[in-house]
Amino acid sequence: MVEKKNLRIVYMGTPDFAVEALRCLVEGGYNVVGVITMPDKPAGRGHKLQFSPVKQYALEHNLPLLQPEKLKDEAFVEALRAWKADLQIVVAFRMLPEVVWNMPRLGTFNLHASLLPQYRGAAPINWAVINGDTETGITTFFLKHEIDTGEVIQQVRVPIADTDNVGIVHDKLMLLGGRLVVETVDAILAGTVKSIPQEEMAVVGELRPAPKIFKDTCRIDWNRPVKRIYDFVRGLSPYPAAWTELVQPGGESVVVKIFETEKIGESHQLVPGTLQTDGKTYIRVAAEDGFVGIRSLQLPGKKKLKTDELLRGFRLTEGCVMK
């Protein structure tokens, strides 16, 4: 058995979700010989270059770093080869070309935030909550050509509460993911891995995809049932946030982001999207089979507020519609 201090690991990742597993490896005494993350991006009003969370961690811990624009670039491939990795680990990064993932002698594994083969794609946590699932999980799997299809190494299941939003589920999976990455490395070191092809895994129901989420994806359809809208808002909160168009009786409209709702099972004959409010404490919107109570929302250029806070400074009247 190879000792962990002699196993040369290259780690690839970009956002906060990827920092936890890197931290677990470094603090656990594993030999991370290099880190690969996205190039710096301009952000904010001053367009200052912003480091990715993984880069920030790597710099703080003096880890060698590469930030390639193109993963097939010869200079990058040679620099990666010079690190002589035995194993590569990928968490929330990019799709890798074969020349990269096939390089280490022990292969490359990925941490994916779903119970594969469910929710292959870029936004698995969002879609699990949007679809009202009561359970999700994390998976480690070996990379192969098609995205998120490689043989599964290990999985951990995680319950989703009816009150959880995507931020809460993200943080649960992030913490468990760090531990699962370490357990997967240990299993590879011990030679005890028995990976399973995804097509041989038992799946309940149909396979659901997890495509990238765009602005248009986040628009609320008030013609849907209350439960579906409630789950939709949870699955996009706090980021990127569900939104709707608030149309005043005079015709002027603003885009409103909605972060928290409640289900109100009260029948009505109203057109979906019809807004009701007392102007002080509550806003509720007609849906297909009841009302959606709005608990937390944000107007353009303003901060996120509870409904009663917003109504103190923003006049809403009967006759408003959400579209």
Q: Predicted segment positions?
A:
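N-terminal glycine-/serine-/threonine-rich beta1-alpha1-beta2 phosphate-ribose binding loop
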Residues: 42-86
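Donor/substrate-binding cores of folate-linked one-carbon enzymes
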Residues: 7, 28, 38, 87-212, ...
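Short beta->alpha connector loops
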Residues: 14-17, 69-72, 92-95, 264
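Internal anion-binding site segments
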Residues: 202-323
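N-terminal Rossmann-like dinucleotide-binding module
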Residues: 2-46
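Residue-level detector of anion-binding/catalytic polar loops
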Residues: 31, 64, 135
